[in-house]
Amino acid sequence: MQRRGFLKWLVSCLAVINGLILGIPFIGTLLSSAATRGKAAWSRVGAVDRLPLGVPVEVRFQSSGTEAYFHRSDLNSVWIIMHSRGDATVFSPVCTHLGCHFTWNQQHGRFECPCHASVFALDGTVLYGPAPRRLDTLPAKIEKGVLYVEYERFQVGTPEKKVI
Ligand code: FES
């Protein structure tokens, strides 16, 4: 092999090695990001024995997940109704009309949104107002007395529940 040919071969080999060193982690990140996109992680909300039965309570908790290349940690809240120590309904705190946070009115036994006066029953159905669909439930599970939630965000202002 001529000296010039050897140098070309050597430079090509170094370029391939350099490409692998830089490219493999990048491709791995893209693949893992694509695999987890749109899938929320389970977040620990708290012990169920501290929650009252049959009465909605708003609970704040820290949720975490990966979006694109970034690990994020957010402070979120959910509305929880414990039907028993092993069964709960968890609502997103976001009104399905335009995204305000609603509250529970204990006196009237209903959820009320302060922005445009949508009113929801204890089971989340719309009683009055412009909300186009019932309150959004979140996936929840109870393991060893601890409630976990998959915190997701949904499109507002539409009759269909769509994760965003
Ligand atoms: S945002 Fe709740 S009623 Fe409009």
Q: Over which residues does each language-model region extend?
A:
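Beta-strand-rich cores of mature extracytoplasmic or soluble domains
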Residues: 106-110, 122-125, 129, 143, ...
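Short Pro/Gly-enriched beta-strand edge/turn motifs at strand-loop
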Residues: 59-64, 119-125
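Flexible, glycine-rich terminal cap/loop adjacent to redox cofactors
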Residues: 100, 117-120
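N-terminal pre-ligand scaffold of iron-sulfur
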Residues: 8, 12, 18, 25-96, ...
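Short alpha-helical basic/polar micro-motif
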Residues: 4, 93, 122
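Short cysteine/histidine-rich metal-coordination sites, predominantly Zn2+-binding motifs
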Residues: 109-117, 127-136
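Twin-arginine (Tat) signal peptide motif
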Residues: 1-7
